[in-house]
Amino acid sequence: MKTLILLIQFFTRIPLPIQINMDEINLKKGSALLPLVGVVIGAWNWLVFSLVALVMPLPVAIIAGLFAEIIITGGFHVDALADTADGLFSSRKKERMLEIMKDSRVGANGVIAICFYFLFYGALFLSVPNIQQIGWLFFVLPIVAKGVTMLLFAKMSYAGSKEGLGSIFLGVPWWPIMIAQGIVLIVLALFFSYIGLIAYAGVLVFTIIYRLFVYKRIGGMNGDTLGAGGQMGQLVCLFCLVLIWGLM
């Protein structure tokens, strides 16, 4: 329970007034619970979307659901997406890319990435067959994001500062990663049957390609690329689901 509370405090802005000594917690092994943080975020997103959908048009409810995640996470990983875009697409050397990612200012690539991310997200949500499935997706996608993050932990080389937040998860064993994947697959199967599993196969392909690209550019992961990977992974999952539904 302490591990889950610490993970919620780490990845969300939920004000849990509980002091936990990190020396007592093995976050590397406890990272198996990371998808449960996605459950908390997803439940909040679903609740906000569902309540707004009762009184407002669907596009407004979708925007509210997307904004709900920013509220509960503090835009933690959206900021990571912007920093990653600024750094990796700066056409600079590795050291300079890492410096750009540390810069608190958002550059042109970061702004473009965020704009297209949310535009694409909204367009895909509007392409989902029915409103019930949209609600399910608001719940499930943050869980998928945490599953992708866990995959990126596998045999991770760390390119950032050893004091960086992502370095906490350097050396995560295989078994927490596999447990996390099992949780994600069960959730997808429960809500979307075999279609969800096929969509996650697409997410796995994306994760491999993304990992190879990042390692080629900066030689490993850092906190920004880990966060961005999760955000893009859930978008890829949504894209795959919409694509499969469109082909059926």
Swiss-Prot record:
Pathway note: Cofactor biosynthesis; adenosylcobalamin biosynthesis; adenosylcobalamin from cob(II)yrinate a,c-diamide: step 7/7
Listed InterPro entries: CobS (IPR003805)
GO cellular component terms, A-Z: plasma membrane
Pfam family, one: CobS
EC number of the protein: 2.7.8.26
Cofactor: Mg(2+)
Main location: membrane
Topology in membrane: Multi-pass membrane protein
Family: Belongs to the CobS family.
NCBIfam families per UniProt: cobS
Function: Joins adenosylcobinamide-GDP and alpha-ribazole to generate adenosylcobalamin (Ado-cobalamin). Also synthesizes adenosylcobalamin 5'-phosphate from adenosylcobinamide-GDP and alpha-ribazole 5'-phosphate.
Protein name, entry field: Adenosylcobinamide-GDP ribazoletransferase
Species: Listeria innocua serovar 6a (strain ATCC BAA-680 / CLIP 11262)
